[in-house]
Curated annotation (Swiss-Prot):
Positions of ATP binding: 123-130
Family: Belongs to the ClpX chaperone family.
Protein name: ATP-dependent Clp protease ATP-binding subunit ClpX
PANTHER family assigned: ATP-DEPENDENT CLP PROTEASE ATP-BINDING SUBUNIT CLPX-LIKE, MITOCHONDRIAL (PTHR48102:SF7), ATP-DEPENDENT CLP PROTEASE ATP-BINDING SUBUNIT CLPX-LIKE, MITOCHONDRIAL-RELATED (PTHR48102)
Length: 425
Protein backbone atom coordinates (compact mmCIF):
# COMPACT_ATOMS: atom_id res chain seq x y z
CA UNK A 1 0.00 0.00 0.00
CA UNK A 2 1.25 3.53 -0.75
CA UNK A 3 -0.36 4.99 2.42
CA UNK A 4 -0.95 3.70 5.98
CA UNK A 5 -2.51 5.19 9.11
CA UNK A 6 -0.07 6.02 11.91
CA UNK A 7 -0.70 6.05 15.71
CA UNK A 8 -1.31 9.80 15.66
CA UNK A 9 -4.16 9.28 13.15
CA UNK A 10 -2.06 11.03 10.40
CA UNK A 11 -1.74 9.30 7.07
CA UNK A 12 1.80 8.01 6.45
CA UNK A 13 2.84 7.98 2.77
CA UNK A 14 5.15 5.29 1.45
CA UNK A 15 7.20 4.89 -1.76
CA UNK A 16 5.38 2.41 -4.01
CA UNK A 17 8.74 0.99 -5.20
CA UNK A 18 11.02 0.62 -2.14
CA UNK A 19 8.42 0.86 0.65
CA UNK A 20 10.19 3.62 2.61
CA UNK A 21 8.00 6.13 4.45
CA UNK A 22 7.96 9.85 3.81
CA UNK A 23 10.05 10.36 6.96
CA UNK A 24 12.85 8.10 5.71
CA UNK A 25 13.44 9.95 2.43
CA UNK A 26 14.03 13.56 1.38
CA UNK A 27 11.24 13.81 -1.21
CA UNK A 28 8.19 11.76 -2.11
CA UNK A 29 6.60 12.52 -5.49
CA UNK A 30 2.92 11.69 -5.93
CA UNK A 31 1.29 10.23 -8.99
CA UNK A 32 -2.23 8.85 -9.55
CA UNK A 33 -2.49 6.56 -6.45
CA UNK A 34 1.29 5.87 -6.46
CA UNK A 35 4.36 7.53 -4.92
CA UNK A 36 8.07 7.46 -5.77
CA UNK A 37 10.91 8.67 -3.55
CA UNK A 38 14.03 10.64 -4.56
CA UNK A 39 16.27 7.60 -3.90
CA UNK A 40 14.32 5.45 -6.40
CA UNK A 41 14.45 8.29 -8.95
CA UNK A 42 18.26 8.45 -8.58
CA UNK A 43 18.48 4.68 -9.01
CA UNK A 44 16.33 4.80 -12.18
CA UNK A 45 18.49 7.59 -13.63
CA UNK A 46 21.62 5.55 -12.94
CA UNK A 47 20.16 2.50 -14.74
CA UNK A 48 19.20 4.65 -17.75
CA UNK A 49 22.69 6.22 -17.88
CA UNK A 50 24.34 2.79 -17.77
CA UNK A 51 22.12 1.51 -20.59
CA UNK A 52 22.79 4.63 -22.71
CA UNK A 53 26.56 4.26 -22.22
CA UNK A 54 26.35 0.56 -23.11
CA UNK A 55 24.37 1.29 -26.29
CA UNK A 56 26.88 3.98 -27.30
CA UNK A 57 29.73 1.50 -26.81
CA UNK A 58 27.87 -1.17 -28.80
CA UNK A 59 27.23 1.30 -31.63
CA UNK A 60 30.89 2.31 -31.68
CA UNK A 61 31.91 -1.36 -31.75
CA UNK A 62 29.39 -2.01 -34.52
CA UNK A 63 30.95 0.81 -36.56
CA UNK A 64 34.08 -1.33 -36.74
CA UNK A 65 35.93 -2.88 -33.83
CA UNK A 66 38.91 -3.61 -36.05
CA UNK A 67 39.03 -0.26 -37.84
CA UNK A 68 41.40 -0.59 -40.84
CA UNK A 69 44.44 1.68 -40.99
CA UNK A 70 44.84 4.28 -43.78
CA UNK A 71 47.24 1.89 -45.57
CA UNK A 72 44.66 -0.92 -45.42
CA UNK A 73 41.90 1.40 -46.64
CA UNK A 74 44.10 2.51 -49.53
CA UNK A 75 44.91 -1.13 -50.45
CA UNK A 76 41.19 -1.98 -50.50
CA UNK A 77 40.46 1.03 -52.73
CA UNK A 78 43.26 -0.09 -55.08
CA UNK A 79 41.36 -3.35 -55.72
CA UNK A 80 38.41 -1.48 -57.22
CA UNK A 81 39.63 1.99 -58.27
CA UNK A 82 42.43 2.51 -60.80
CA UNK A 83 44.65 5.59 -60.55
CA UNK A 84 43.69 8.67 -58.48
CA UNK A 85 46.49 7.88 -56.00
CA UNK A 86 46.47 11.22 -54.17
CA UNK A 87 42.67 11.22 -53.85
CA UNK A 88 42.74 7.68 -52.39
CA UNK A 89 45.39 8.72 -49.86
CA UNK A 90 43.40 11.80 -48.77
CA UNK A 91 40.19 9.75 -48.47
CA UNK A 92 41.89 6.95 -46.52
CA UNK A 93 43.20 9.39 -43.89
CA UNK A 94 39.92 11.35 -43.66
CA UNK A 95 37.74 8.25 -43.27
CA UNK A 96 40.13 6.65 -40.77
CA UNK A 97 40.14 9.80 -38.62
CA UNK A 98 36.34 10.07 -38.81
CA UNK A 99 35.63 6.53 -37.57
CA UNK A 100 38.48 6.68 -35.04
CA UNK A 101 36.72 9.76 -33.63
CA UNK A 102 33.43 7.83 -33.43
CA UNK A 103 35.11 4.97 -31.55
CA UNK A 104 36.21 7.39 -28.83
CA UNK A 105 32.89 9.27 -28.56
CA UNK A 106 31.91 7.77 -25.19
CA UNK A 107 35.20 8.73 -23.52
CA UNK A 108 35.53 11.97 -21.55
CA UNK A 109 38.13 14.31 -22.99
CA UNK A 110 39.02 17.99 -22.87
CA UNK A 111 39.45 18.19 -26.66
CA UNK A 112 36.32 17.85 -28.77
CA UNK A 113 37.06 16.43 -32.23
CA UNK A 114 34.97 17.94 -35.01
CA UNK A 115 33.83 16.08 -38.12
CA UNK A 116 35.76 16.40 -41.40
CA UNK A 117 33.42 15.97 -44.36
CA UNK A 118 34.90 15.50 -47.83
CA UNK A 119 34.59 17.29 -51.19
CA UNK A 120 35.59 15.36 -54.33
CA UNK A 121 36.29 17.40 -57.46
CA UNK A 122 36.82 15.64 -60.77
CA UNK A 123 35.38 15.05 -64.26
CA UNK A 124 32.53 12.66 -65.04
CA UNK A 125 33.56 9.02 -64.88
CA UNK A 126 36.75 9.61 -62.88
CA UNK A 127 35.69 7.40 -59.94
CA UNK A 128 34.11 9.76 -57.37
CA UNK A 129 31.01 7.65 -56.69
CA UNK A 130 32.95 4.38 -56.84
CA UNK A 131 35.40 5.62 -54.19
CA UNK A 132 32.54 6.46 -51.80
CA UNK A 133 30.74 3.15 -52.47
CA UNK A 134 33.93 1.14 -51.90
CA UNK A 135 34.62 2.92 -48.61
CA UNK A 136 31.12 2.17 -47.29
CA UNK A 137 31.40 -1.51 -48.30
CA UNK A 138 34.82 -1.81 -46.65
CA UNK A 139 33.63 -0.28 -43.36
CA UNK A 140 30.29 -2.13 -43.42
CA UNK A 141 28.25 1.01 -42.76
CA UNK A 142 24.95 2.16 -44.33
CA UNK A 143 25.45 4.13 -47.55
CA UNK A 144 23.23 6.24 -49.76
CA UNK A 145 23.76 8.27 -52.95
CA UNK A 146 21.75 11.48 -53.35
CA UNK A 147 21.51 13.66 -56.45
CA UNK A 148 21.79 17.33 -55.49
CA UNK A 149 19.97 18.44 -58.67
CA UNK A 150 16.69 16.84 -57.47
CA UNK A 151 16.74 18.71 -54.14
CA UNK A 152 14.75 21.86 -53.41
CA UNK A 153 14.06 23.95 -50.32
CA UNK A 154 11.37 22.68 -47.95
CA UNK A 155 7.92 23.77 -49.13
CA UNK A 156 8.76 23.69 -52.86
CA UNK A 157 8.07 20.96 -55.41
CA UNK A 158 10.95 18.48 -55.38
CA UNK A 159 12.85 16.43 -52.82
CA UNK A 160 13.42 17.79 -49.33
CA UNK A 161 17.02 17.41 -48.07
CA UNK A 162 15.72 15.26 -45.20
CA UNK A 163 14.68 12.66 -47.82
CA UNK A 164 18.40 11.79 -47.97
CA UNK A 165 18.30 10.63 -44.34
CA UNK A 166 15.08 8.72 -45.03
CA UNK A 167 16.84 6.76 -47.81
CA UNK A 168 19.79 6.10 -45.49
CA UNK A 169 17.38 4.69 -42.89
CA UNK A 170 15.73 2.49 -45.52
CA UNK A 171 19.15 1.04 -46.40
CA UNK A 172 19.67 -0.14 -42.80
CA UNK A 173 16.09 -1.30 -42.06
CA UNK A 174 15.31 1.83 -40.03
CA UNK A 175 17.97 1.13 -37.38
CA UNK A 176 18.61 4.70 -36.22
CA UNK A 177 21.91 3.92 -34.41
CA UNK A 178 23.35 2.38 -37.59
CA UNK A 179 22.14 5.24 -39.78
CA UNK A 180 23.77 7.80 -37.48
CA UNK A 181 27.19 6.31 -38.36
CA UNK A 182 26.59 5.93 -42.10
CA UNK A 183 28.04 7.61 -45.19
CA UNK A 184 26.04 9.93 -47.46
CA UNK A 185 27.39 10.70 -50.95
CA UNK A 186 25.84 13.82 -52.51
CA UNK A 187 26.52 13.84 -56.26
CA UNK A 188 26.37 16.84 -58.61
CA UNK A 189 27.01 19.27 -55.74
CA UNK A 190 28.39 21.75 -58.30
CA UNK A 191 24.97 21.95 -60.03
CA UNK A 192 23.43 23.75 -57.02
CA UNK A 193 25.90 26.63 -57.11
CA UNK A 194 24.28 30.04 -56.97
CA UNK A 195 24.09 31.88 -60.25
CA UNK A 196 26.53 34.61 -59.16
CA UNK A 197 28.79 35.21 -56.19
CA UNK A 198 26.57 38.13 -55.09
CA UNK A 199 23.51 37.21 -52.98
CA UNK A 200 20.37 37.58 -55.08
CA UNK A 201 17.12 39.22 -53.98
CA UNK A 202 15.14 36.66 -56.00
CA UNK A 203 14.43 33.18 -54.63
CA UNK A 204 16.82 30.46 -55.80
CA UNK A 205 15.01 27.33 -54.60
CA UNK A 206 17.37 24.81 -56.20
CA UNK A 207 20.65 26.71 -55.73
CA UNK A 208 21.68 28.72 -52.69
CA UNK A 209 18.50 27.71 -50.83
CA UNK A 210 19.41 24.03 -51.13
CA UNK A 211 22.98 24.78 -50.04
CA UNK A 212 21.59 26.41 -46.87
CA UNK A 213 19.36 23.39 -46.20
CA UNK A 214 22.25 20.97 -46.81
CA UNK A 215 24.47 23.03 -44.52
CA UNK A 216 22.26 22.24 -41.51
CA UNK A 217 22.23 18.55 -42.39
CA UNK A 218 26.01 18.35 -42.90
CA UNK A 219 27.04 20.26 -39.77
CA UNK A 220 24.68 18.22 -37.59
CA UNK A 221 20.97 18.49 -36.84
CA UNK A 222 18.07 16.37 -35.62
CA UNK A 223 16.33 15.30 -38.82
CA UNK A 224 12.66 14.30 -38.52
CA UNK A 225 11.94 11.32 -40.76
CA UNK A 226 8.52 9.66 -41.23
CA UNK A 227 8.62 6.01 -40.04
CA UNK A 228 8.71 3.48 -42.89
CA UNK A 229 8.81 6.25 -45.49
CA UNK A 230 5.79 8.14 -46.78
CA UNK A 231 4.97 11.83 -46.75
CA UNK A 232 5.08 14.00 -43.65
CA UNK A 233 1.83 15.04 -42.02
CA UNK A 234 1.28 16.81 -38.68
CA UNK A 235 -0.42 13.96 -36.76
CA UNK A 236 2.26 11.28 -37.16
CA UNK A 237 5.25 10.31 -35.06
CA UNK A 238 8.69 10.95 -36.56
CA UNK A 239 11.98 9.14 -36.17
CA UNK A 240 14.62 11.55 -34.89
CA UNK A 241 18.02 11.05 -36.55
CA UNK A 242 21.07 12.98 -35.36
CA UNK A 243 23.24 13.75 -38.41
CA UNK A 244 26.24 14.96 -36.35
CA UNK A 245 28.23 11.76 -36.87
CA UNK A 246 27.15 10.93 -40.43
CA UNK A 247 30.06 11.32 -42.86
CA UNK A 248 29.07 13.45 -45.85
CA UNK A 249 31.05 13.12 -49.09
CA UNK A 250 30.09 15.65 -51.77
CA UNK A 251 31.20 15.23 -55.37
CA UNK A 252 30.96 17.16 -58.60
CA UNK A 253 32.64 17.77 -61.96
CA UNK A 254 32.88 21.56 -61.37
CA UNK A 255 33.14 22.34 -65.09
CA UNK A 256 34.72 25.78 -65.47
CA UNK A 257 36.39 25.79 -62.05
CA UNK A 258 39.79 25.58 -63.75
CA UNK A 259 39.09 28.95 -65.43
CA UNK A 260 38.38 30.53 -62.03
CA UNK A 261 41.65 29.09 -60.66
CA UNK A 262 43.63 30.28 -63.70
CA UNK A 263 42.19 33.80 -63.40
CA UNK A 264 43.32 33.93 -59.79
CA UNK A 265 46.78 32.48 -60.50
CA UNK A 266 47.25 34.74 -63.56
CA UNK A 267 46.79 37.79 -61.31
CA UNK A 268 49.68 36.62 -59.13
CA UNK A 269 51.98 36.11 -62.12
CA UNK A 270 52.77 39.77 -62.80
CA UNK A 271 56.24 41.31 -63.04
CA UNK A 272 59.49 40.86 -64.96
CA UNK A 273 60.49 37.66 -63.13
CA UNK A 274 57.06 36.02 -63.33
CA UNK A 275 56.80 32.78 -65.30
CA UNK A 276 53.58 32.97 -67.28
CA UNK A 277 52.15 29.85 -68.93
CA UNK A 278 49.52 30.16 -71.61
CA UNK A 279 46.09 28.80 -70.65
CA UNK A 280 46.29 26.23 -73.44
CA UNK A 281 49.49 24.76 -71.99
CA UNK A 282 47.89 24.00 -68.63
CA UNK A 283 45.90 20.81 -68.37
CA UNK A 284 42.75 20.82 -66.23
CA UNK A 285 44.20 17.98 -64.11
CA UNK A 286 47.22 20.21 -63.34
CA UNK A 287 45.05 23.18 -62.36
CA UNK A 288 42.35 21.55 -60.17
CA UNK A 289 44.74 20.48 -57.34
CA UNK A 290 45.42 24.21 -56.79
CA UNK A 291 41.78 24.77 -55.74
CA UNK A 292 41.38 27.25 -52.89
CA UNK A 293 38.18 28.04 -50.90
CA UNK A 294 37.97 31.44 -52.64
CA UNK A 295 37.76 29.66 -56.03
CA UNK A 296 34.81 27.55 -54.85
CA UNK A 297 33.07 30.68 -53.51
CA UNK A 298 33.62 32.38 -56.88
CA UNK A 299 32.21 29.25 -58.57
CA UNK A 300 29.00 29.61 -56.54
CA UNK A 301 29.24 27.59 -53.32
CA UNK A 302 28.39 29.49 -50.15
CA UNK A 303 31.32 30.04 -47.71
CA UNK A 304 29.53 28.25 -44.85
CA UNK A 305 29.16 25.05 -46.91
CA UNK A 306 32.81 25.15 -47.98
CA UNK A 307 33.76 25.51 -44.31
CA UNK A 308 31.88 22.26 -43.55
CA UNK A 309 33.81 20.40 -46.29
CA UNK A 310 37.41 20.87 -45.09
CA UNK A 311 38.90 17.81 -46.85
CA UNK A 312 39.20 18.46 -50.61
CA UNK A 313 40.44 15.77 -53.01
CA UNK A 314 40.76 16.30 -56.76
CA UNK A 315 40.54 13.49 -59.30
CA UNK A 316 42.32 13.58 -62.65
CA UNK A 317 40.75 12.88 -66.03
CA UNK A 318 41.41 9.23 -66.93
CA UNK A 319 43.67 8.65 -69.93
CA UNK A 320 43.64 5.69 -72.35
CA UNK A 321 46.07 3.60 -70.26
CA UNK A 322 44.00 4.06 -67.08
CA UNK A 323 40.75 3.17 -68.88
CA UNK A 324 42.29 -0.04 -70.27
CA UNK A 325 43.42 -0.92 -66.73
CA UNK A 326 39.88 -0.30 -65.46
CA UNK A 327 38.56 -2.76 -68.06
CA UNK A 328 40.78 -5.64 -66.92
CA UNK A 329 42.39 -5.09 -63.48
CA UNK A 330 39.84 -4.40 -60.68
CA UNK A 331 38.15 -7.24 -58.79
CA UNK A 332 34.88 -6.47 -60.56
CA UNK A 333 36.48 -5.42 -63.89
CA UNK A 334 34.05 -5.20 -66.82
CA UNK A 335 35.92 -7.75 -68.94
CA UNK A 336 35.82 -10.25 -66.04
CA UNK A 337 32.08 -9.65 -65.68
CA UNK A 338 31.34 -10.35 -69.35
CA UNK A 339 33.68 -13.35 -69.36
CA UNK A 340 31.66 -14.72 -66.42
CA UNK A 341 28.37 -14.08 -68.26
CA UNK A 342 29.52 -15.97 -71.35
CA UNK A 343 31.10 -18.72 -69.24
CA UNK A 344 27.58 -19.44 -67.96
CA UNK A 345 26.81 -20.43 -71.58
CA UNK A 346 29.97 -22.55 -71.67
CA UNK A 347 31.71 -20.05 -73.97
CA UNK A 348 35.09 -18.32 -73.55
CA UNK A 349 35.35 -14.58 -74.24
CA UNK A 350 38.58 -13.08 -75.58
CA UNK A 351 38.93 -9.31 -75.97
CA UNK A 352 42.15 -8.48 -77.76
CA UNK A 353 44.46 -5.66 -76.55
CA UNK A 354 43.70 -3.53 -79.64
CA UNK A 355 39.99 -3.83 -78.84
CA UNK A 356 40.57 -2.70 -75.24
CA UNK A 357 42.41 0.39 -76.50
CA UNK A 358 39.61 1.09 -78.99
CA UNK A 359 37.01 0.94 -76.17
CA UNK A 360 39.11 3.39 -74.09
CA UNK A 361 39.50 5.82 -77.02
CA UNK A 362 35.77 5.71 -77.73
CA UNK A 363 34.98 6.54 -74.06
CA UNK A 364 37.43 9.48 -74.19
CA UNK A 365 35.78 10.81 -77.38
CA UNK A 366 32.37 10.57 -75.73
CA UNK A 367 33.74 12.37 -72.62
CA UNK A 368 32.09 9.79 -70.36
CA UNK A 369 35.23 8.47 -68.64
CA UNK A 370 35.00 5.05 -66.98
CA UNK A 371 31.21 5.37 -66.79
CA UNK A 372 30.90 4.94 -70.56
CA UNK A 373 32.95 1.73 -70.82
CA UNK A 374 30.07 -0.63 -70.04
CA UNK A 375 27.74 0.78 -72.70
CA UNK A 376 30.45 0.45 -75.38
CA UNK A 377 31.19 -3.17 -74.44
CA UNK A 378 27.49 -4.01 -74.11
CA UNK A 379 26.80 -2.58 -77.56
CA UNK A 380 29.60 -4.66 -79.11
CA UNK A 381 28.40 -7.90 -77.49
CA UNK A 382 24.64 -7.35 -77.86
CA UNK A 383 24.11 -9.49 -81.00
CA UNK A 384 26.34 -12.28 -79.68
CA UNK A 385 24.50 -12.45 -76.34
CA UNK A 386 21.18 -12.46 -78.23
CA UNK A 387 22.14 -15.31 -80.60
CA UNK A 388 24.45 -17.40 -78.41
CA UNK A 389 21.77 -19.49 -76.65
CA UNK A 390 20.58 -20.69 -80.11
CA UNK A 391 24.05 -21.61 -81.39
CA UNK A 392 25.49 -25.07 -80.79
CA UNK A 393 29.17 -25.87 -80.39
CA UNK A 394 30.48 -22.30 -79.95
CA UNK A 395 33.73 -22.49 -77.98
CA UNK A 396 35.02 -18.92 -78.02
CA UNK A 397 33.92 -15.37 -78.88
CA UNK A 398 36.69 -13.02 -80.03
CA UNK A 399 36.36 -9.22 -79.99
CA UNK A 400 38.92 -7.19 -81.92
CA UNK A 401 39.32 -3.51 -82.80
CA UNK A 402 37.09 -3.72 -85.88
CA UNK A 403 34.19 -4.99 -83.73
CA UNK A 404 34.47 -2.02 -81.37
CA UNK A 405 34.62 0.41 -84.31
CA UNK A 406 31.50 -1.20 -85.80
CA UNK A 407 33.27 -2.46 -88.94
CA UNK A 408 32.89 -6.20 -88.25
CA UNK A 409 30.84 -8.46 -85.95
CA UNK A 410 32.50 -10.57 -83.23
CA UNK A 411 34.30 -13.73 -84.32
CA UNK A 412 32.73 -17.03 -83.19
CA UNK A 413 35.04 -20.04 -82.90
CA UNK A 414 33.47 -23.50 -82.99
CA UNK A 415 34.84 -26.82 -81.77
CA UNK A 416 36.95 -28.32 -84.58
CA UNK A 417 35.32 -25.99 -87.10
CA UNK A 418 36.24 -22.91 -89.05
CA UNK A 419 35.72 -19.48 -87.41
CA UNK A 420 32.36 -17.89 -88.14
CA UNK A 421 31.23 -14.30 -87.71
CA UNK A 422 28.16 -13.55 -85.59
CA UNK A 423 24.98 -13.02 -87.60
CA UNK A 424 26.26 -14.76 -90.80
CA UNK A 425 24.13 -17.51 -92.37
Amino acid sequence: MAEKKGSSSEKLLYCSFCGKSQHEVKKLIAGPSVFICDECIDLCNEIIRDEATASEKDAAAATRSDLPTPHEIRESLDQYVIGQEQAKKILAVAVYNHYKRLKHLGKKDDVELSKSNILLIGPTGSGKTLLAQTLARLLNVPFVIADATTLTEAGYVGEDVENIIQKLLQNCNYEVEKAQRGIVYIDEIDKISRKSDNPSITRDVSGEGVQQALLKLIEGTMASVPPQGGRKHPNQDFLQVDTTNILFICGGAFDGLEKVIMQRSDKTGIGFAAQVQSKEEREVSEVLPQTEPEDLIKFGLIPELIGRLPVVATLAKLDETALVQILIEPKNALVKQYQKLLAMEGVELEIRPAALSAIARKAIRRKTGARGLRSILEQSLMDVMYDLPNYKGVQKVVIDESTINGDAPPLLMYEEQQPKVSGSN
